[in-house]
Amino acid sequence: MQKVKLPLTLDPVRTAQKRLDYQGIYTPDQVERVAESVVSVDSDVECSMSFAIDNQRLAVLNGDAKVTVTLECQRCGKPFTHQVYTTYCFSPVRSDEQAEALPEAYEPIEVNEFGEIDLLAMVEDEIILALPVVPVHDSEHCEVSEADMVFGELPEEAQKPNPFAVLASLKRK
């Protein structure tokens, strides 16, 4: 399949009325906010989007995005590659009242003063939300072993004497 660059903005209502589908990419240079959240963006962001009008006459955008990124393991500090995949379902709104009236299945996405949505920002937001909160290797690939991870009580050598024990002995006198 030929890699086609996706538009940055478009009118979702007109696109939904035409029932258009898009398949294409955003390059790693375009997804600057994703790049700030990870060590590196290793592949193009592959997206597919489908626009339609539902039974309630709402414009609907269904789609998915996937990208390979490098994250830093929070256990051992070493980089590792991670495949991010996300799906989304949006309906364009102009106001908070319209957003409140949307069915639960749809997420609201605000249109600008020209009636367009920022597709790149929407895809970036969804990828950032799909990133792990605490990125870690799988246990078998991480250099930090289970024995190195201490949970619960600290070992005896790590416990220090109470500095206020002297005051407690003076109080007894």
From Swiss-Prot:
Disruption phenotype: Accumulates reduced levels of 23S rRNA, no significant difference in 16S or 5S rRNA levels, nor in rpmF transcripts (ribosomal protein L32, next gene in its operon). No visible growth defects on rich medium at 37 or 25 degrees Celsius. GO terms for biological process: ribosome biogenesis. Keywords: Ribosome biogenesis. GO terms for cellular component: cytosol. Transmembrane segments: none annotated. Induction: Part of the yceD-rpmF operon. InterPro entries: YceD, YceD_bac. The keyword Zinc does not apply. Belongs to the DUF177 domain family. Plays a role in synthesis, processing and/or stability of 23S rRNA. NCBIfam families: PRK11193.1 (NF008395). PANTHER family: LARGE RIBOSOMAL RNA SUBUNIT ACCUMULATION PROTEIN YCED. This is Large ribosomal RNA subunit accumulation protein YceD. The lineage of its organism: Bacteria, Pseudomonadati, Pseudomonadota, Gammaproteobacteria, Enterobacterales. The gene is yceD.
